[in-house]
């Protein structure tokens, strides 16, 4: 499974959204209905899945599906 597919799978599981709604430009809060706690849990799930550390200042910048994919790809 590609990084993109794994990130999308985590988003679907964490936010309880349909896979069809997880588009690259989708904002976690505005488009996918996440709140700030959801986004923290999402970052924690990404850290666990990809065995990476995401500092708070970087986590704040991860606001869309594509930004999550890009971050993981650049920090693997």
Swiss-Prot record:
Cell inner membrane among keywords: no
Q: Which compartments is it annotated to reside in? A: Cytoplasm
Could you name the domain of life of the organism this protein comes from? Answer: Bacteria
Record keywords: Disulfide bond included?
no
Residues annotated as domain Carrier: 1-76
Q: Which Gene Ontology BP annotations are present?
A: lipid A biosynthetic process
Pfam families (UniProt xref): PP-binding
Q: Name one GO cellular component term.
A: membrane
Q: Provide the GO MF annotations for this entry.
A: acyl binding; acyl carrier activity
Q: Which family does the entry's similarity section mention?
A: Belongs to the acyl carrier protein (ACP) family.
Spell out the protein name for this chain.
Acyl carrier protein
Species of the source: Histophilus somni (strain 2336)
**Source taxonomy lineage?**
Bacteria, Pseudomonadati, Pseudomonadota, Gammaproteobacteria, Pasteurellales
């Amino acid at each position: 499974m590609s990084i993109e597919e794994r990130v999308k799978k985590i988003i679907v599981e964490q936010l309880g959204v349909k896979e069809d709604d997880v588009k690259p430009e989708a904002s976690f809060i505005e488009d996918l209905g996440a709140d700030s706690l959801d986004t923290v849990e999402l970052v924690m799930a990404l850290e666990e899945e990809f065995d990476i550390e995401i500092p708070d200042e970087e986590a704040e910048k991860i606001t869309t599906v594509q930004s999550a994919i890009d971050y993981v790809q650049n920090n693997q």
